[in-house]
Amino acid sequence: MNNSLENTISFEEYIRVKARSVPQHRMKEFLDSLASKGPEALQEFQQTATTTMVYQQGGNCIYTDSTEVAGSLLELACPVTTSVQPQTQPEQQIQVQQPQQVQVQVQVQQSPQQVSAQQLSPQLTVHQPAEQPIHVQVQIQGQAAQPAAPSIQTPSLQSPSPSQLQAAQIQVQHMQAAQQIQAPEIPEEHIPHQQIQAQLVAGQSLAGGQQIQIQTVGALSPPPSQQGSPREGERRVGTASVLQPVKKRKVDMPITVSYAISGQPVATVLAIPQGQQQSYVSLRPDLLTVDSAHLYSATGTITSPTGETWTIPVYSAQPRGDPQQQSITHIAIPQEAYNAVHVSGSPTALAAVKLEDDKEKMVGTTSVVKNSHEEVVQTLANSLFPAQFMNGNIHIPVAVQAVAGTYQNTAQTVHIWDPQQQPQQQTPQEQTPPPPQQQQQQQLQVTCSAQTVQVAEVEPQSQPQPSPELLLPNSLKPEEGLEVWKNWAQTKNAELEKDAQNRLAPIGRRQLLRFQEDLISSAVAELNYGLCLMTREARNGEGEPYDPDVLYYIFLCIQKYLFENGRVDDIFSDLYYVRFTEWLHEVLKDVQPRVTPLGYVLPSHVTEEMLWECKQLGAHSPSTLLTTLMFFNTKYFLLKTVDQHMKLAFSKVLRQTKKNPSNPKDKSTSIRYLKALGIHQTGQKVTDDMYAEQTENPENPLRCPIKLYDFYLFKCPQSVKGRNDTFYLTPEPVVAPNSPIWYSVQPISREQMGQMLTRILVIREIQEAIAVASASTMH
């Protein structure tokens, strides 16, 4: 016999090989089927078997598979796939859910039409499952007022579902100011004759002969709610999702229909192949993204008593593209005046001022209403402006909002009324401050060109200095980070074009470097280089460089914007952004709390809550968890220098559990660290006041220092948990969320620890904790 048994394996070995390819979440089902059905179970799992591949990219190992990763502790395995919310008026979105398949008729031609990357935009996106990618060109013939419904035919889109395919009709109507359309789930009794209406901006009617082009493009990731759906013919809605280059998976190429309508946002219809309902990542370098427009329609300026000038965004409901609806407001604050506002504006009929003090946050609004004009004066400063103090009071910048029209007067001035500058002289008794029970009314005048309205503001005289936090942001605003990036990219591109004109043309076809204004579509290398340059070149509206804490706040806003729009790049810890973290460290390393000439300490723009918002604190990744532990050790153990953190070790951090005397079942756990370990004498009795302590946070376990410390120990190698020379271990470059080991046995370098600590010392709560500890030590 010529048949050889060299390449054969036993049945038991074949079962082991097959078991390795079964996904983790189906392993129990595979074993049960193997026990009950025997060899037939191997045939059932023939199609579901997947292969895990490992390949090299730079210095990292990239794991590629199509299985779902089980969730880990503290929601660590949750993927960052968030839907893109429309930011501006022209952006539209249609969400359609349909219980059964929709029959789509398409006329297929031999010559496929190509669509350029600039024509594709997922601002109007509908996902529809398809069996295979095809190239189709469809012609729509319609009237100017109401287009005819397109009729499409193709056998390749029909699914062999036992139920009959239902017909759907799409009608496009025109409507003004249509920003977002969401079609709820249609009852089954209305399925045979359902209608889906898509609203477009008025003034753009479909002319006869406009083309609808279809082209295969990279797959976009559907939202997590679409995973594992049993409906095969359900039409789905997805958004552009660009994931981190470390985590890539192979997907099929779907169909994209691009509706090219002149003057309107380009609509993209994406079809995901049937059976692929997991969160996929496109391998294509050219990404379909959402075009983000400018959010500020006009810009005003404000001048402080010291001569500094800042830019105030003036929010408006008018479209940004109309130059007639934009206005510029200049607000000048005299040095000798404060505590009253005098605004000169267009004729109005009514003015109202309301000042409230709620939860240490004062909100002042002035609403001026007319039939065709509305004016709003906001005394809350822009989040990028530092607090300014004069004579024990705060100068509050005033932002003027044009809602229904433009201002008639081009110049507006803010006059501030000082009760101490009245012509009549006060007696020495009157100049003494009254007791806290007595309050003095301060007059606030809002004067328009037609009439004046006076409103009394009650403010305690015994509190001449309101909280400086009134002028500082309480949370991150991603649109501010995007706006700063856009302004810098426009300025930088203009400089590059100007330099290119003065130089000789480069040899070959090398294109000039241009920074994209859309952060989502920016490549990793381009974004890293752009952020590096921003640390030195970013300027505010007046051309002045940002303060270091404000610049750090802007980068945190950019980080949150990336996460909210489907990018999982961590610009503060990923290896791709090492250059950026080094440049940012050079900016922040010499930051000290700012003190005014009167002795007031200006708090930092960056707060602890902001870092939780943009996932810089928590257990989302090994680097984030390490940063969180360093943050808690700095805040509670008061470790302010790199040397102090280097002395921290696993053996020096003690875990303690206390029982409640009244309730033995009630236990509280804490971790303790001996303060100033080197100053205590040998043999000296250690008391409780010598320890710095971190306590539990039962209200929010995801932010509990004890649980995060336990999770850190759980992810560290067993051999290092008793070491007395290190505490911060080096994170592994690429790990799975449910991997048992996240860190190597090597401690992090001194340079890396210094960069992490520099960013932590800028946080407002850290500065306050250090200031309180220093004050208590002096006393």
Curated annotation (Swiss-Prot):
Major location (coarse): nucleus
Stretch list, region Disordered: 141-163, 219-242, 420-443
Stretches assigned to the CARD domain: 6-48
Chain positions found as N-acetylmethionine: 1
Assigned keywords, A-Z: Acetylation, Cell membrane, Cytoplasm, Isopeptide bond, Membrane, Nucleus, Phosphoprotein, Transcription, Transcription regulation, Ubl conjugation, Unfolded protein response
One GO term describing the cellular component: cytoplasm
Domain topic, free-text comment: The CARD domain may be involved in the regulation of caspase activity in the context of programmed cell death.
Family matches, as PANTHER family: TRANSCRIPTIONAL REGULATOR QRICH1, ZINC FINGER MYM-TYPE PROTEIN
Functional note: Transcriptional regulator that acts as a mediator of the integrated stress response (ISR) through transcriptional control of protein homeostasis under conditions of ER stress. Controls the outcome of the unfolded protein response (UPR), an ER-stress response pathway that either promotes recovery of ER homeostasis and cell survival, or triggers the terminal UPR which elicits programmed cell death when ER stress is prolonged and unresolved.
Name of the protein: Transcriptional regulator QRICH1
